[in-house]
Amino acid sequence: MSTVNELVNRIDETYEVSQIEKEIKLDNIALSDLELLATGGYSPLTGFLGKEDYDSVVETLRLANGSVWSIPITLPVTEEVAESLKTGEEVKLVNNGNIYGVIQIEDIFIPDKEKEALLVYKTTDEVHPGVKKLYERPNVYVGGTIILTKRFENNQFPSYRLDPIETREEFKKRGWKTVVGFQTRNPVHRAHEYIQKSALEIVDGLFLNPLVGETKSDDIPADVRMESYEVLLQNYYPKNRVFLSVFPAAMRYAGPREAIFHALVRKNFGCTHFIVGRDHAGVGDYYGTYEAQEIFTNFTIEELGITPLFFEHSFYCTKCEAMASTKTCPHGKEDHVILSGTKVRELLRNGEIPPSTFSRKEVVEVLIKGLKKEVVTE
């Protein structure tokens, strides 16, 4: 399937901002969203959502024009800031004293956050990290088209930070007609590896695209994860069939809705297929094991523009002596070693070394070293 959808480009580093007086301070989530809006990662969006699109996304998982979009990309400001703004004006977008862009204000509105929590996250429980963040952020939303006037400096992983136009170019250069995207916020364990390699059997290339934006505090730090991906790819994957690049967005933990969002974004990066495993983008027990796969039945592949590949929970079977899933293994649960990112994190934090059935030894070494460093700096 072709992914030649038009990429939005809202970057203009020559844009004159010196005459613009008013400013909105961006938090880290809004800052990463600004970059992804401008580079086309969030195509077809050209800015932060106005009320009509926001309501439509929250209620129907579509923009007002009917295009599929499942996560509201919003710019929250305080009541005090909102009172100083009016529609029709241009305002600077600032973070940490740097001007990164401007927004042409089209809308200023107060959202129903409880409704947003219930429909987007399926819960109003403030223990849920996505809901907690939603309630912590300011209460008024500003909508409008953006322009990115300054690219980010001091990026972590500069050599792995590619815009959608660049990843598309890379895939083309490699002659890949079909590319499967894999989203992760965890180190890659053996179950992930099994799924990725199964998918790689039917496409030309694998795009490993770990999320490195804001995550919850007990997730393994991005720099440690990146090193673990590097050693894994170096030792266990064919170099000409995989490509590693980071996804600078914040994690929403919105489960099924975020699975759709992750697929749409990977389409923009140039993927034709996207892997959806068990409890994709889930947290705790808020979502059913395969709910993130079931949500895709609400949309056609044509309107998504990308083909989801669904995988069941995989495990190491001691009888098969191999990675397997219930589709390929006849043995009972007592023979299955269940692997999960949570379990790997738990073992490591307790100072235990995960067995080789869980994780490659090179990966485990990187994680142990990284977590030791973390303890020292805490």
UniProtKB/Swiss-Prot annotation:
Pfam families: ATP-sulfurylase, PUA_2
Keyword Lyase: no
CDD domains noted in UniProt: ATPS
Family: Belongs to the sulfate adenylyltransferase family.
InterPro entries reported for this sequence: ATP-Sase_PUA-like_dom, PUA-like_sf, Rossmann-like_a/b/a_fold, SO4_adenylyltransferase_pro, Sulfurylase_cat_dom, Sulphate_adenylyltransferase
Enzyme type, top EC level: transferase
SUPFAM superfamilies xref list: Nucleotidylyl transferase (SSF52374), PUA domain-like (SSF88697)
EC number(s) from the headed UniProt entry: 2.7.7.4
Disulphide bonds in the chain: none
The name this protein goes by in its record: Sulfate adenylyltransferase
Pathway listed: Sulfur metabolism; hydrogen sulfide biosynthesis; sulfite from sulfate: step 1/3
GO aspect biological process, one term: hydrogen sulfide biosynthetic process
Catalytic reactions on record: sulfate + ATP + H(+) = adenosine 5'-phosphosulfate + diphosphate
GO molecular function: ATP binding; sulfate adenylyltransferase (ATP) activity
Domain of life of the source: Bacteria
Record keywords: ATP-binding, Nucleotide-binding, Nucleotidyltransferase, Transferase
Protein encoded by which gene: sat
